[in-house]
Design a protein with these regions (language model features):
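Non-catalytic, surface beta->alpha helical segment in thiol-disulfide oxidoreductase systems
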Residues: 56, 62-89
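Conserved short-loop catalytic and cofactor-binding motifs
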Residues: 11-12, 69
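Hydrophobic heptad-repeat coiled-coil signature
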Residues: 14-17
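Short, internal strand/loop/helix patches
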Residues: 38, 43, 48, 61, ...
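Short, small-residue-biased leader/transition segments that mark boundaries at the very start
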Residues: 1-2
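Structural cue for short, hydrophobic secondary-structure segments
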Residues: 8-10, 62
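Thiol-based oxidoreductase modules, predominantly thioredoxin-like and allied folds used
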Residues: 9, 20-28, 32-47, 54
């Protein structure tokens, strides 16, 4: 069985992060049986962001069974995010 998660690296002051947040919440609700969406505030957890090499936000890492399978950098509208995530949903 595959375990899929999407980790959204974000910060409160980041406008694009705040724009993509509700979109990710919708995707999470619509695909709850396929992927888990987690949020990590880079201001509150800088060491974790550094560990994953996060240089700009928003950055979304798709993890499949403990391995990063895809990285998406920057805000996207919902249709574009769904297209990037289609292999995981």
């Amino acid at each position: 069985m595959l375990f899929r998660s999407l980790v959204d690296f974000w910060a409160e002051w980041c406008g694009p992060c705040r724009a993509v947040g509700p979109i990710l919440e919708e995707i999470a609700a619509e695909n709850a049986d396929k992927i888990t969406v987690l949020k990590l505030n880079t201001d509150e957890e800088p060491s974790i962001a550094m560990k994953y090499g996060i240089a700009s936000i928003p950055t979304m890492n798709v993890d499949v069974n403990g391995q990063i399978a895809k990285t998406i950098i920057g805000a996207r509208p919902k249709p574009a995010l769904l297209k990037e995530l289609e292999a995981f949903l």
